[in-house]
Amino acid sequence: MSNLCPCNSQLPYSECCEPYLLGTKNAPTAQALMRSRYSAFVTHNADHLIKTWHPSCRTPSLRDELIATFPNTQWLGLHIISAQENPRDNEAFVEFSACFIEINADDKQYLHERSRFLKIDDCWFYIDGVQPKVGRNDPCPCGSGRKYKKCCEHNRK
């Protein structure tokens, strides 16, 4: 792994997501948690993903389901579209686009999600997410600056 964090923050991994993945620090914001979860997918860190999933959403098979996806998916990049956070609130939203390739697929694909996070006892947890509808003439959520119809419309997961 290069020294830069896989979350595309342009910060060194050791100063960005690594402390969260090692469990030495808690993510101070929902966006930081989102970035750390992306980095956990890149580095195949199922423990961090499970620990940061809201307890009400953890199923007995979650670890096996996560581990099964790791060898088949190569994560290529994360683009944060927006973050709606208020330090006094216990709920926050982060909209992002993540580029990946499934091993048996030919094309890059994009996961576009508006994730919801809840804060419990000063710890942020991922609870759920929805895939926003993107108009064909809207800017592509991958961050390319091109229209969605000319960019990733056919590669959305």
Swiss-Prot record:
Coiled coil: none annotated. It comes from the Bacteria. InterPro entries: NTF2-like_dom_sf (IPR032710), SEC_C_motif (IPR004027), UPF0225 (IPR023006), YchJ-like_M (IPR048469). It holds the Pfam family YchJ_M-like. HAMAP family: UPF0225. Belongs to the UPF0225 family. This is UPF0225 protein PMI1492. It comes from Proteus mirabilis (strain HI4320). The lineage of its organism: Bacteria, Pseudomonadati, Pseudomonadota, Gammaproteobacteria, Enterobacterales.
